[in-house]
C-alpha cells in the first residue's frame, strides 16, 4: 500500500508520500519504477492517492483530457464542497470511460469511487474518501497502510517542528520505518497558503 501525508503550518502546506509499489508479496521499489512518485499535480493542486496503482493513471488521464482542459468538466479543489462536487461530476466519467467498478459493500449508502486521496493546495489540506466524503484538516493527516505511524509521528512533532515540510517528511519516514508496505525515498511538495487561509 502506501504512506501519504499532508501537513499545514506557518502559512504553508506540504504533501509527501513514500515510493514503493507492491502487488501482493511482490514489491517494486523506486530503483526499478520509473514513475514512483505517488503525488500528481493538476493546476495548483497536489493529489496523493492510495489503493490501486491504476488510480493515478486514471486521474492523470482525466486531468489531461480535452473536456477538463477546455473546462467542460470543471475540476475545483478550493473547498470541501467544490472537491465533493468535482468528484461527484467525475464519478460517472470514471464509470463510463474508465470502467470503474463502483461496487463495494452491499450496505454502503452510495456507490464507491474506490479512491482515497489527500489534496494540498493554496486553500488548505483535504482528504477525499471512497464515498466522496471530503474532510478539511487543520494541522495534518495521513492515509494508507502506514497512516497510523505517520499520524502518531506528526502529532509528536507538530508543536516543535518549524515547517509543514518537516512534519510531513517525518510522518512518511515513520510510515516507511514501521509499515512493511511503505518505503523510502519520499517525494514532497510545498505550497504557500493564500493569505486569507493562512491566518
Question: What are these language model-derived features?
Answer:
Residues 165-180:
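Short, conserved aromatic-histidine micro-motifs
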Residues 1-104, 110, 136-151, 155-165, ...:
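Conserved short S/T/G-enriched processing/targeting/catalytic segments and their helical context
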Residues 44-47, 120, 171:
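Compositionally biased, low-complexity repeat tracts
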Residues 110-143:
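Long, charge-patterned amphipathic alpha-helical coiled-coil/hairpin "stalk" segments used as oligomerization
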Amino acid at each position: 500500500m502506501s504512506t501519504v501525508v499532508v501537513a499545514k503550518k506557518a502559512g504553508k502546506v506540504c504533501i509527501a508520500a513514500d515510493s514503493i509499489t507492491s502487488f501482493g508479496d511482490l514489491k517494486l521499489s523506486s530503483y526499478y519504477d520509473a514513475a514512483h512518485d505517488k503525488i500528481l499535480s493538476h493546476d495548483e493542486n497536489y493529489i496523493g492517492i492510495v489503493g490501486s496503482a491504476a488510480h493515478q493513471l486514471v486521474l492523470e488521464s482525466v486531468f489531461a483530457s480535452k473536456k477538463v482542459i477546455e473546462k467542460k468538466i470543471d475540476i475545483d479543489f478550493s473547498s470541501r464542497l467544490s472537491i465533493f462536487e468535482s468528484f461527484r461530476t467525475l464519478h460517472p466519467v470514471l464509470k463510463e470511460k474508465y470502467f470503474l467498478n463502483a461496487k463495494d459493500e452491499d450496505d454502503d449508502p452510495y456507490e464507491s469511487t474506490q479512491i482515497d486521496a489527500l489534496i494540498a493546495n493554496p486553500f488548505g489540506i483535504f482528504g477525499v474518501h471512497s464515498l466522496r466524503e471530503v474532510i478539511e484538516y487543520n494541522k495534518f493527516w495521513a492515509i494508507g497502510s502506514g497512516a497510523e505511524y505517520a499520524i502518531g509521528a506528526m502529532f509528536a512533532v507538530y508543536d516543535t517542528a518549524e515547517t509543514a515540510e518537516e512534519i510531513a517528511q517525518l510522518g512518511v519516514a515513520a510510515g516507511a520505518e514501521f509499515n512493511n508496505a511503505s518505503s523510502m525515498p519520499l517525494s514532497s511538495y510545498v505550497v504557500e497558503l493564500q493569505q486569507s487561509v493562512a491566518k
